[in-house]
Amino acid sequence: MGSAVRIAMVAGEASGDLLASHLIAALKTHLPDAVFYGIGGPKMQAQGFDSWWPMEKLSVMGYWDALKHYREIAGIRRQLKKRLLDLKPDIFIGVDAPDFNLGLETNLKAAGVRTIHYVSPSIWAWRGGRVKKIAKAVNRVLALFPMEPALYEKERVPVTYVGHPLADIIPLQTSKQAVREKLSLPRDYPIFAMLPGSRQGELAMMAETFVETAKIIRERHLPNAMFVVPLATRETRLQFELAIYNRQAGDVPFRLLFGHAQDALGAADVSLVASGTATLEAALIKRPMVITYKIAKFSYWLMKRMAYLPYVGLPNVLAGRFVVPEILQDEATPENLAEALVKLYEDKENAEAVEEAFTEIHLQLRQNTAEKAARAVIECLN
């Protein structure tokens, strides 16, 4: 293996950007001269990654959103495929974004480029038949969750269980009072974290519902409640501010943070979280939460028809049971969400049971992920 190893990568959203940035950092300790290029976000770029298109171009949610942006995304994939086939990198790593990456990986593998898919698609939840497509696309899958390797081994797809980097990063115990002090929040007030998502499409669906939920909690249940809202980008912050204006909630004490999701979750008694990686962060910080989500009606209908499991939130999937409530789609009214959040806030016994279940998950996922993943990549290169 020559010294300047060329590693192409594609990440499609914030969670993939985080995973890939840790992997790049770990790979650089083994391969200091390696070059990294493709499509990635700000965290990857901070590690020296050369992103040819903005990652946001690939961040779509649900079938309807994907259809609306199909032409643009297909154009990017076509140009990217041509460029990568011309450059022939030593290895290609698709980070999540299976609908974009698997087809690309299939083409590259057929042309002799080694391919890895980092983050197994949710074949345990729906569309399990994808495992056959994955087998054609990749030389190896890097799986984040402990129930995944067996599904690949059954189909003779090389797989490495690497755990989840958030489990390495987040300490096993987080002091609520220490985080409140850091954020200058009162020690004894009811505090709710609200995580409406990281993408603009999610905010468009969820922001006003979250704001209205906060209003109801203050007006009908806990008049001194406060709400901490971490937002990933300037655009999503503006969307949330607009939702506050639209719902006439200027008097509700929202504390909007740029990023700092873990601080928001750590300071909170209870969290309201839009389904996704943020639910895993909330679980690792071990606070009770309500998981919620709204997507386009057609996308939801399709997913319900194809789903294998009764739950969608990662914490419940990993526990194999409903540890925390899920209030989805038409059920996700501000009244229902407020009632569920207040109920969790008042049930201290349940908070202890939740902490116990989430500690078990944390220990399972804590695997020194970035290093394990880097070693699997190097093994594939050799």
Curated annotation (Swiss-Prot):
GO molecular function term, any single one: phospholipid binding
Name of the gene encoding the protein in the UniProt record: lpxB
The name this protein goes by in its record: Lipid-A-disaccharide synthase
Family: Belongs to the LpxB family.
Keyword field contains Transferase: yes
NCBIfam families assigned to the protein according to its UniProt record, in alphabetical order: lpxB (TIGR00215)
GO cellular component, one term: membrane
PANTHER family: LIPID-A-DISACCHARIDE SYNTHASE, LIPID-A-DISACCHARIDE SYNTHASE, MITOCHONDRIAL-RELATED
